């Protein structure tokens, strides 16, 4: 039973045992959705999106509606008092009066942590800059445990933008908590994993990893391939973005080199890093991953609201 946990700012806010509770509850919801369709009757979720989002925002909204709750919020901060100079602290204080739980995406690292200081209701971090995206991580873990029979003993390839990709940083931190996982980090040097991940996560936890630049050299050894897009919004230089955007494209030829039981994951949206021909491959798991994301958010909100 999760006790005294008011916010989800990063995956480390939950113990491994508490994460297992959430995943088990998500599986119950998947198996028996009607049993949960009114569990959040009378509850209101506020969605505060200071950055553009389609899948994460709609996933949260669908999750709360499927639980019987209601939604309020914004996806365009310029249409709110924020455009008049209202501080994050004041916004959170006001919104926590109107709602029972808040999910927030913000371009500044640490914004969700700041919000949690001023909120009287649970805060769920839906992404803060290039820092953390914990509910995507929960979706990733639920996908892996469901499709690969648990969260231990995997060789995980992570490919693309490892520098700015907050989903990548959160996933490495989370999977490092489980047993005998190894990482293959695939990126151009310009988008390599940050040094703090190497030192504070991988080295500190004695996690085996290698860094390479060619996907085709390592794909045959992988149990899981986690693809990411090169994020245009993190670049100040258009030429550099265009040069790196097409660094890695997963196509049928590369899939032919992979294990029969490898799964391909992606946090979405994709640009062109996964060819559409791969969608027909039974190993393509990214749309299933998005579906799992909704169910794990349902389970998370049930736990944080204490309605079960």
From Swiss-Prot:
Pathway: Pyrimidine metabolism; UMP biosynthesis via de novo pathway; (S)-dihydroorotate from bicarbonate: step 2/3. Carbamoyl phosphate binds at residues 55-56, 105, 133, 136, 268-269. PROSITE patterns: CARBAMOYLTRANSFERASE. Keywords: Pyrimidine biosynthesis, Transferase. Belongs to the aspartate/ornithine carbamoyltransferase superfamily. ATCase family. Catalyzes the condensation of carbamoyl phosphate and aspartate to form carbamoyl aspartate and inorganic phosphate, the committed step in the de novo pyrimidine nucleotide biosynthesis pathway. This is Aspartate carbamoyltransferase catalytic subunit.
């Amino acid at each position: 039973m999760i006790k005294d946990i008011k916010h989800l700012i990063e995956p480390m806010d939950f113990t491994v045992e508490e994460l297992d509770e959430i995943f088990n509850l998500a599986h119950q919801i998947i198996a028996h959705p009607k049993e949960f369709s009114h569990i959040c009757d009378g509850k209101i979720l506020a969605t505060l999106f200071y950055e553009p989002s389609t899948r994460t925002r709609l996933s949260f909204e669908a999750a709360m509606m499927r639980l019987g709750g209601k939604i309020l919020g914004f996806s365009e901060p310029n249409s709110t008092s924020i455009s008049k100079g209202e501080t994050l602290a004041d916004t959170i204080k006001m919104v926590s009066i109107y709602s029972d739980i808040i999910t927030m995406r913000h371009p500044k690292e640490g914004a969700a942590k700041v919000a949690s200081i001023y909120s009287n209701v649970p805060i769920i971090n839906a992404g803060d800059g290039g820092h953390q995206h914990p509910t995507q991580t929960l979706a990733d873990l639920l996908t892996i445990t469901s499709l690969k029979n648990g969260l231990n003993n995997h060789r995980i390839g992570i490919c693309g933008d490892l520098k700015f990709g907050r989903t990548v940083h959160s996933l490495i931190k989370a999977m490092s908590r489980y047993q005998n996982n190894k990482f293959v980090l695939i990126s151009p040097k310009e988008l390599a994993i940050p040094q703090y991940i190497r030192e504070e996560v991988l080295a500190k936890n004695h996690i085996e990893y290698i860094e390479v630049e060619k996907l085709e050299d390592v794909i045959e050894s992988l149990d899981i391939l986690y693809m990411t897009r090169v994020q245009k919004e993190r670049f100040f230089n258009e030429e550099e973005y265009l040069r790196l955007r097409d660094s890695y494209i997963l196509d049928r030829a590369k899939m032919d080199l992979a294990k029969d039981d490898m799964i391909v994951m992606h946090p979405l949206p994709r640009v062109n890093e996964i060819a559409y021909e791969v969608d027909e491959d039974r190993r393509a798991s990214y749309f299933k991953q998005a579906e799992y994301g909704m169910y794990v958010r349902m389970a998370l909100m049930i736990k944080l609201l204490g309605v079960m």
